[in-house]
Amino acid sequence: MLFWVTDSFSLSVPGASWSDDESDTNRKGSGVFLLNLELIENDNNQEENSVSIDILPDDIHERILSRLPLSAIFKAACVCKKWNQIVHSKKFTLTDANFLSEKTWYFMFTSSAEPVGYLYDSGLRKWYNFELPFLVHHTWKIAPSCGLVSFMDDETCKKIHICNPITREYETLKNPPSPGFPVYSALAFSVDQSNSKYTISIVRAMQASEDFLSWLVSIHIYNSKEKTWLPPVMGGMEGWRPGDVSLICDNILYILVFCTRPNEVQNFHGLITYNLETFNPIGVLKEESVISAPCALTCGRLMKVQRQVVLVGGIGRADRPGVIKGIGIWVLNGKEWKEVTRMPQKFVQGFGELDDVFASSGGGDLIYIQSYGGTAVLIYDMDTRQWFWCQKCQMHKKFPLEIFSGFCFEPRLQFM
């Protein structure tokens, strides 16, 4: 491999998906490994010397590539055959590129007919035009884990996509059969990298009484090693029902439940747990097993941040449950919630039209909060205990009722 040494050069990336300009709609399904990268030399009369780095051992090449930002790694993969082989090698993706997962990235999308959006690099604090390999709607259930993201169409509940957004590799699973028509369903997803497997959980709730007090609950577990859905755990709940929020953390399934008794405000939300190692359903759905929420909540979300179960939600008013007075973050400590922080009022006001419905997603050290009505994204760093805004996204609102949403994930180069 030869590099031509000149006074200066530039990289031209025509049609690249990793672009700071308008997205290229002609690269659907082509992945993010850029094929059109060109090294453009300045046309001048100065003497140029060719320098070969082919004599360098592979481990030096790997160390050079592993120091690059993620977007630059994809571009470098197209410079020469050797670098392309290294970037795609299992050794590089499993070892040298582990630093890529230190900070989660955020993908923002809208109610568009195209699978396009913007991807936020939290390390470089930069947005990229980005495209998923399939169309995702804001009503879909989305669950990330270790670089992979699970998507479930909540309208049809027929298919689940397991995708690496960075490499655009994905596989599709059929949903397990349901014993009835589910009113609510919750998706959870967990990757075990040491054993190269993943687990999917779907919790379904079906109405069992006209007064909405009794609910039939089914828990479906998929093991990728066996490539099969286990027999569902079935049971009933009185006075509580699962919603659309669940999480897997350290082989424990956490399910956010809602009180179905009238005039209940303070304890409107709760949490139940199910051990995925023992598969013992006894007592899981009993009322005495419910862990009360820290306060009246709206738009509660569970997420795994710093290897802990974290709850993010709007802090409701006791007299007006649909109105929030702020947004809080809590960590589960045993069977109690410990408050970490509340969003400062200046940031609440910065959202403008932030109401009781908003999106939140977290992983690694970062928690992302976004209003469904706009593109502003606020980040809370659990490590530094600081709030800060994302750089302004170039996505614009095209009509008044347009809905924006997003999710975070760890950028990785390998599928498993």
Model-derived features: positions:
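Short, conserved recognition motifs on repeat-domain binding surfaces
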Residues: 1-416
